[in-house]
């Protein structure tokens, strides 16, 4: 067949490199409204749920039992379930119905009922609802700070830059598992150099991650995963109860804690039980609520390639963020793994959360070039900073970031690199050369960094852990090296571990180390003139884009 020239051009477009698949309900490859999803139902006897979404208590699997016993407001359940799904959907977008009124209903309905509510809503209505249902009034952002070589100097410099760019949380992980303590240490020092009060985590194997937190090298955890079918749980030798125990281990030691889930995970692992991705995710969100965990990272997360490949998949991602907020949970709304070759698709996917605002719009944005992102690449990376800042300016939307100058960025990267150099020297760790400090000051990514002696580093990591190095040792090393401000910031982060105030729902810290959470900054949106509004000071910051032609400069 003779080819159309237009179709030849279209075939070369980036979007046509994306993988898309038709709906296959039997294998769970359907975003919402699978013919195999259960109809919603609930029955309460003697204060106990004895029927849930078409199953009697005798038929419950362990997830049903956990949800029925711990996650639903039982006294209100039968009354709330009598409301029509369309009526609840309309309440979600009605500015005359408060968030508080809706929470009383949405914490008392079942996972299947939530699906029926979401089925009534288009993405604009979901965004309207999310703007109202977000737990914390003020939106914010989280980033990834990693690199291919696990270079601690580069991590410190990138973390400092991410701090001045406005990220409230920063997350790292490793290429080599044994590097975790160095990465956590570098992230802590760099982030507190960039901005006081940034929360940090190192996503690794749970025992190591918990130990790093207990030593004061990290301040939160989020990669404790939960799933929507029993088979996926047991495949990992887990149950909702074991996950709840792990969550309490973090929180009881003063570490902020959220779970992670996301549409598509069960289908990806081959245990979907023919249910839709959103129904199974709804169960995950209820598990989170039942475990007493304050928040959830969801939005397909690392399974976005699966969810984004099926029809209405990106709509389902927005719906799962909304469902989590309807359970009065903190929402870290993903946008954290690349899923499309198309700049148009990846931007549209992000606008679903950026426009209404979530507790963390990204979880996280890659603060490094994606070739250095050890979480498999983010939807936006360091090369998109200017685009993102101009989007905020174009739309007058607070996406949690701020423009920075080249001069201040170079200065803060240099300070962070010198600070981590001093810490390594004071703690007797492998020396960081002036060449490394200079390279990190000006680097874009690991391609611009000299190699370190990995064998020597890993031996030092092991020795550091045997010596029981803690956050207080870091404070002492910085103080004795003249970095009093960073030392003070880290000491204040350690104090937060004692007070525990930042364990509140949706908590972040401002630059004075005051907690900003759903307790003291509760979202009170009820239409125009209410809820979060960009202040004059913040708007001036957003507008301050480098290269803007100022009227006074025109001759």
UniProtKB/Swiss-Prot annotation:
Its cofactor is adenosylcob(III)alamin. Its EC number is 4.2.1.30. Keywords: Cobalamin, Cobalt, Glycerol metabolism, Lyase. One of its GO terms (biological process) is glycerol metabolic process. One of its GO terms (molecular function) is cobalamin binding. It holds the Pfam family Dehydratase_LU. It catalyses: glycerol = 3-hydroxypropanal + H2O. It is an enzyme of class 4 (lyase). Gene3D superfamilies: Diol/glycerol dehydratase, large subunit (3.20.20.350). Belongs to the diol/glycerol dehydratase large subunit family. Probably consists of three subunits: large, medium, and small. This is Glycerol dehydratase large subunit. The gene is dhaB.
